[in-house]
């Protein structure tokens, strides 16, 4: 299969899965393993994530701009920013310290990804079925303690296959946030988290950048951006109607198929 076709596939998969609780990293790594995509290696995976980051900024630009311009006068805007920063810190700190181990060991073990997808799917099913009356319905007004605990849950996503979105959504639901606000807070938290991961990965892999790969990277980036914009615009309403169970079953199916593929194909 030509590299440009694989770049389109991986870019679309990145965009579609980054902001739903199915683990974009798990999907990208498994696809890369089975499809044999090695043209740009780690650099490609890093660069297409930037497309997903820009998608959130694009969709929520008006809201983010309002927060930024009222930061000096509006206590609610300052608390929202503080909640995102506080939620980011645990995974940001742990990810920085464990980056090399995670990339060298966990990211190179497809079986770990498959098992994480399956276990995370069952965990998401359990959390989704908890019938507790939501206390918090506005992602911009979560208490700081709630935001920090959601951030602790995000640390679980350092294990590939767990899903950053899945971990933060599960944490938010357990803290009695409603499903729509849990999804939105996960979007906002994704921006500093993914930007931090992007910066660290790029700093460690920039020497691998090559002008020969620019076209493939650009193609994957654009596909990820467009797919992520569509996903971010649709997923909150979908979650409000259907909950997170469809994503949980998808995770379980992908993880099981991945294990079968590893057993019979390698």
UniProtKB/Swiss-Prot annotation:
Pfam families: BacA. Keywords: Antibiotic resistance, Cell inner membrane, Cell membrane, Cell shape, Cell wall biogenesis/degradation, Hydrolase, Membrane, Peptidoglycan synthesis, Transmembrane, Transmembrane helix. It comes from the Bacteria. The keyword ATP-binding does not apply. It is a multi-pass membrane protein. GO terms for cellular component: plasma membrane. InterPro entries: UppP (IPR003824). Its main location: membrane. NCBIfam families: PRK00281.1-2, PRK00281.1-4, undec_PP_bacA. Belongs to the UppP family. This is Undecaprenyl-diphosphatase. The gene is uppP.
């Amino acid at each position: 299969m030509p590299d440009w076709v694989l770049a389109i596939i991986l870019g679309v998969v990145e965009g579609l899965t980054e902001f739903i609780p199915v683990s974009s990293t798990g999907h990208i790594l498994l696809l890369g393993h089975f499809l044999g995509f090695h043209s740009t290696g780690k650099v490609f995976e890093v660069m297409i994530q930037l497309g997903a980051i820009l998608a959130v900024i694009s969709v929520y630009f008006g809201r983010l701009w309002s927060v930024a311009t009222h930061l000096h006068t509006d206590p609610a805007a300052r608390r929202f920013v503080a909640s995102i920063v506080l939620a980011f810190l645990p995974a940001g700190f742990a990810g920085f310290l464990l980056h090399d181990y995670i990339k060298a060991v966990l990211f190179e073990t497809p079986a770990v990804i498959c098992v994480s997808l399956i276990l995370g799917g069952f965990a998401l099913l359990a959390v989704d079925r908890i019938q507790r009356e939501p206390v918090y319905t506005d992602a911009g007004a979560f208490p700081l303690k709630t935001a920090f605990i959601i951030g602790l849950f995000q640390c679980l996503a350092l294990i590939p296959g767990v899903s950053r979105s899945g971990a933060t959504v599960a944490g938010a639901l357990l803290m009695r946030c409603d499903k729509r606000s849990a999804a939105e807070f996960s979007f906002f938290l994704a921006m500093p988290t993914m930007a931090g991961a992007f910066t660290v990965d790029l700093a460690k892999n920039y020497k691998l950048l090559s002008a020969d790969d620019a076209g493939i990277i650009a193609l994957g980036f654009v596909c990820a951006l467009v797919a992520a914009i569509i996903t971010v615009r649709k997923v909150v309403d979908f979650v409000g109607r259907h909950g997170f169970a469809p994503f949980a079953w998808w995770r379980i199916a992908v993880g099981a198929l991945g294990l079968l593929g590893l057993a019979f194909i390698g």
